[in-house]
A protein has these predicted regions:
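Flexible inter-repeat linkers and adjacent short helices
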Residues: 1-155, 160, 301, 310-317, ...
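TPR-adjacent "capping" and linker segments in tetratricopeptide-repeat scaffold/adaptor proteins
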Residues: 63-74, 101, 186-187, 283-295, ...
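Structural signature of alpha-solenoid helical repeat junctions
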Residues: 72, 106, 145-147, 184-191, ...
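Tandem amphipathic alpha-helical repeat scaffolds
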Residues: 76-86, 109-124, 149-164, 191-206, ...
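Helix-turn-helix repeat elements of alpha-solenoid scaffolds
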Residues: 82-96, 119-137, 160-179, 203-218, ...
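Flexible helix-coil transition and linker loops at the boundaries of alpha-helical arrays
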Residues: 97-107, 136-148, 178-189, 221-230, ...
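Alpha-helical scaffold segments of alpha-solenoid architecture
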Residues: 206, 214-319, 323, 327, ...
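Ankyrin-repeat and related helical/solenoid repeat scaffolds used for protein-protein interactions
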Residues: 319-345
Length: 365
């Protein structure tokens, strides 16, 4: 793929040397330069390794887009779909899922990522999303390892939307078994990293903090994972310290935000708002000064009012929220001094299996 030889356009001359790029990519200097000079075929996995040492996300995606314009190798296209999905570049992914491919397995990937895009754009949530996945299961070839892993991973997301974190214990082993069958390479790394992030979040919600951090550490050790995945791992790592070490939590939240600020796609902007809002939550419950631009949800605005003894203002905000979550009901119970509502909110936390954030009841009286 000769177009990628233009890598020199996005790396300054003193950075583009065989020793540095070889170290970044784990490719031999000979293999690296033969690839860049077109003597050895460029693969998507190799391209990602080369680009992983560069800071400009926008320029990385320009090179990725150029690569995809000039390749018809479907193995590369399948991995590219997955990488773009995890990176949050939905526009580039849209371009790939609108095409018809020669290989049925590539069309299976295409159909799976169409559903992924529907979920990301909120047109499919909870029960409807699970129904769509169950329908998809009957249409794709589950004997293909990559297809099997993606489908079962999506099922976990569907149950998580419903708060059923315990379903992980059933599916995790099944998915990991299939991942173990995958050949070593970028797709396996992405599969393992996504599963570890899912596991980490489920462990955290069940208050298995040590296991959550161990899963996240495995993700953060991987160099070629998308920046959005790294930022997500850092944000969950930060969450694990919210109640015990707020200073450490804020440190990791800022690391996550520094990664997210380098991204310009819609998914990263939504993630950034979520991380900023969780940072604000951490600050407010520990009476640490908070940046007002970090508060994006009415619930956190109400919580700040409560901490400032402005309960009537908090009540006004919370009463305007329809279908309040358990934590929003809890805030309202504090603002109104309603012990019955507090008990109701507590039981909703238990029912949802959220054993981590239930600690908020001991902090806010």
């Amino acid at each position: 793929m000769n177009k990628v030889a233009s890598l020199g356009d996005i790396v300054s001359g003193d950075e583009l040397n065989s020793v540095k790029l070889s170290r970044i990519t784990n490719l031999s200097q000979s293999n690296l330069w033969k690839t860049l000079n077109g003597k050895v075929p460029m693969t998507f996995a190799k391209l990602v390794k080369i680009l992983s040492g560069l800071n400009s996300e926008e320029e990385k995606m320009e090179v990725v887009q150029e690569f995809l314009k000039h390749t018809d190798k479907e193995a590369d296209i399948r991995i590219a779909m997955y990488y773009l999905y995890l990176s949050g570049y939905t526009e580039l992914l849209h371009g790939l899922v609108e095409k018809e491919y020669k290989q049925s397995v590539t069309n299976n990937y295409r159909d799976i990522f169409r559903v992924c895009l529907d979920r990301q754009t909120h047109s499919l949530r909870s029960g409807a999303f699970l129904k769509e996945i169950e329908s998809l299961r009957t249409q794709v070839n589950l004997n293909k390892t990559g297809v099997n892993i993606l489908i079962n991973t999506l099922i976990i997301y569907g149950y998580f939307d419903l708060g059923a974190y315990n379903v992980l214990t059933v599916l995790q082993g099944m998915i990991q078994e299939k991942i173990n069958e995958m050949p070593r390479g970028l797709e396996k790394t992405l599969n393992e990293s996504e599963l570890n992030i899912i596991c980490a979040y489920a462990y955290l919600m069940q208050d298995e903090v040590k296991m959550a951090r161990e899963s996240l550490q495995k993700v953060l050790e991987k160099q070629e994972i998308p920046r959005l995945l790294k930022a997500t791992a850092l944000s969950i790592f930060a969450e694990s310290y919210i109640f015990c070490e707020p200073d450490k939590a804020l440190h990791f939240f800022e690391l996550s935000l520094s990664e997210l600020r380098k991204l310009k796609n819609n998914k990263s902007l939504l993630k950034r708002k979520l991380v900023e809002n969780t940072t604000a939550f951490c600050c407010i419950i520990h009476n640490i000064p908070v940046k007002l631009e970090y508060i994006h949800d009415d619930a956190e605005i109400a919580l700040q009012c409560i901490r400032q003894n402005k309960n009537s203002e908090a009540c006004k905000i919370l009463n305007q929220i329809s279908n309040r979550t358990a934590i929003q009901d809890f805030y309202l119970s504090i603002a109104t001094n309603d012990e019955g509502l507090r008990r109701k909110a507590y039981h909703r936390f238990l029912k949802d299996g959220n054993l981590f954030y239930i600690k908020i009841f001991d902090i806010l009286k």
